[in-house]
């Protein structure tokens, strides 16, 4: 019986070590980054995602990727997994939305960019940002309570819907 508990303890420690190794080490981060890249690229042929950097630690996240060598996604900041707190900045620039049609399942045209912050915890979170959707000057603020939207404010100026 004692051998069983020792074996079980060793197995649990091994599993925890493996999860830690995959999620929070440089080697594990490169594995996860490659997995994300391959998953997106294998499921379709029109868009090529290249993960330039994926770093996840117990306290931070950094995700930097390019799409078709001319569009970028960057997410960086504090991500406290066990405390369920987030304070990240994001910056997304898509040079041509029509190239993403097979992913979005919508016919869209023109460039798109958005940047802002996502800050909060499991009980209350806030997303604030700016965008140029439809060549507009857009600002937005979303408040989430228990990950459910409770307040959404959008201010869109000079939108040119025909360009979308």
Predicted regions and their residues:
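Hydrophobic membrane-insertion alpha-helices, especially the h-region
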Residues: 6-20
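Flexible, membrane-facing loop/turn or short amphipathic-helix motifs
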Residues: 61-79, 94-109, 126-146, 158-164
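Positively charged n-region of N-terminal signal peptides that target proteins for export
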Residues: 1-4
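Terminal hydrophobic membrane-targeting helix
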Residues: 18-89, 95-103, 114-123
